[in-house]
């Protein structure tokens, strides 16, 4: 099966058929983000790109002081995890699972990590990781919250069978109605 991703519109296709993303499923469960301010959203995207650049090359290029503080938090996390750079293999790859797709930020041997730069939303953040976990209880999941003061916080999320069932049900509804 061929999985394609179009960043314009955040659209996934499996063998040419449009399917919902993890983000769309989570938004259908918890509602859309209340009027997302484009500035923090763009900053979060840029910080993610810097983190991926750092994993890919072991270096970064930015003169944005505000974003650099978030990147410093990420660099501390990399150092404390003793990750040898460059480590492009850790950058998340697209997943396709029974009618939905997504791209986790970081995928290790047994852990999926999702980087967050905004306000912590525990239920929503956990549900997103449940989608990436795809029912595999052996995979550990963590949210890595990067803070603007150069610190970070890890929240480990446990597998939750009920949340997995809710996620699957919403994926089926979206696939049936094609409203995504």
Listing of model-derived features with the role each one plays in the protein:
Residues 1-101:
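Metal-dependent nuclease catalytic cores that hydrolyze phosphodiester bonds in DNA/RNA
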Residues 93-180:
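Nucleic-acid nuclease catalytic cores
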């Amino acid at each position: 099966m061929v999985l394609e991703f179009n960043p314009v519109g955040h659209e996934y296709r499996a063998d040419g058929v449009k399917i919902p993303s993890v983000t769309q499923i989570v938004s259908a469960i918890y509602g859309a983000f209340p009027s997302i301010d484009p500035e923090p959203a763009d900053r979060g995207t840029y910080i993610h790109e810097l983190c991926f650049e750092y994993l890919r090359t072991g270096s970064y290029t930015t003169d944005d002081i505000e974003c650099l503080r978030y990147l410093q938090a990420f660099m501390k996390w990399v150092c404390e995890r003793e990750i040898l750079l460059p480590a492009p293999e850790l950058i998340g790859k697209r997943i396709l699972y029974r009618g939905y797709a997504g791209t986790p930020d970081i995928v290790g041997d047994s852990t999926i990590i999702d980087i967050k730069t905004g306000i912590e939303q525990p239920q929503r953040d956990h549900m997103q990781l449940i989608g990436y976990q795809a029912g595999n209880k052996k995979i550990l999941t963590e949210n890595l919250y990067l803070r603007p003061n150069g610190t970070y916080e890890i929240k480990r999320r446990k597998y939750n069978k009920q949340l997995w069932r809710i996620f699957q049900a919403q994926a089926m509804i979206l696939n049936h109605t094609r409203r995504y």
